[in-house]
C-alpha cells in the first residue's frame, strides 16, 4: 500500500508462528514478506535495533476462532508486555477486523492438523480453507507506555496485558461500527 509513497513509513516486521517454517511454501512466502519466526530472541533483537514489530498477542489461538467467535478476543499471552518493558518499547494497540469474514471457519480439525505439522486445519462452509474476498480494516490506537523491567510479578504483568486487551477490544468495536456505518 505504501509502494508509491515518496517517504514510506517504517516497515513493521511480523512474527510468524513457529509451525509455519515446517510448511514447504509458507516459510518461503513469510521470509520474502519480511516475517520472522516467532521466537522471543528474534523479537528482542528487532526491538533493540529500533525496528517496528507487529505482534498478535492471541497467538495461534486467535486464528482458530470460529465464525461466531470472530469479534471476540481469546486470552492474550504475557510475553509481548514483558518484552516491551525489557526493551523500553511502547505498545501501539491495533484492531484488525474482517479476517473472520475472509475465512468463515465453522470447525477446526486439530488431530488432522497435528498430523501435517499444523496446530489445526480450518473447515469452512465450502470445505476448503481458502479466503473469500473481504474488506480487512486495521485501525491503530495511541501508544501505551508501561514502566518496569519485564521481571515483574505475573499479577502485575497480567494487569498490563488486560489494559492492552481492553484497548484493542475498544478499537475493534469502533472499527466495526465505522464499517457498519453506525454513529460513534
Feature locations, PLM:
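Catalytic core of membrane glycerolipid acyltransferases/transacylases, capturing the structured
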Residues: 1-49, 60-73
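Non-catalytic C-terminal accessory region of glycerolipid acyltransferases
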Residues: 45-184
Amino acid at each position: 500500500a505504501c509502494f508509491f509513497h515518496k517517504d514510506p513509513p517504517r516497515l513493521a516486521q511480523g512474527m510468524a508462528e513457529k509451525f509455519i517454517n515446517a510448511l514447504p511454501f509458507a516459510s518461503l512466502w513469510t521470509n520474502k514478506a519480511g516475517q520472522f519466526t516467532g521466537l522471543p530472541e528474534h523479537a528482542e533483537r528487532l526491538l533493540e535495533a529500533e525496528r517496528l514489530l507487529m505482534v498478535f498477542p492471541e497467538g495461534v489461538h486467535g486464528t482458530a476462532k470460529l465464525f461466531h467467535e470472530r469479534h471476540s478476543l481469546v486470552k492474550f499471552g504475557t510475553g509481548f508486555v514483558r518484552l516491551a518493558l525489557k526493551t523500553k518499547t511502547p505498545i501501539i494497540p491495533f484492531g484488525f477486523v474482517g479476517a473472520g469474514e475472509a475465512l468463515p471457519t465453522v470447525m477446526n480439525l486439530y488431530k488432522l492438523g497435528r498430523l501435517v505439522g499444523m496446530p489445526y486445519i480450518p473447515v469452512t462452509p465450502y470445505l476448503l480453507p481458502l479466503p473469500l474476498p473481504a474488506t480487512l480494516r486495521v485501525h491503530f490506537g495511541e501508544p501505551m507506555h508501561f514502566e518496569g523491567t519485564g521481571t515483574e510479578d505475573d499479577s502485575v504483568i497480567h494487569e498490563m496485558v488486560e489494559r492492552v486487551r481492553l484497548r484493542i477490544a475498544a478499537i475493534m468495536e469502533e472499527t466495526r461500527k465505522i464499517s457498519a456505518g453506525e454513529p460513534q
